[in-house]
């Protein structure tokens, strides 16, 4: 999955890839400025209210999210919410305890 963001000065493309090191090398070789950032993937049920349940879990646990975007699991077709948070392991444990499928 990928998401873009741009301004007058620069653009940002966020990508989830299977081989981050290879992607960094390929993009850097072409002159792109790259940064590897850890994110958390949470598989959502494909039904109304699934995103709300995830967001309520984050809110109830007082978890701040820097950014999020939606992707999908190519094998299952299920939606995956990609989250950037400060403490990935803590958030992972918290969401798993609340019944969310953390990837």
Task: Give, region by region, the residue ranges found by the protein language model.
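A conserved regulatory-domain signal marking ACT and ACT-like small-molecule sensing domains
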Residues: 1-103
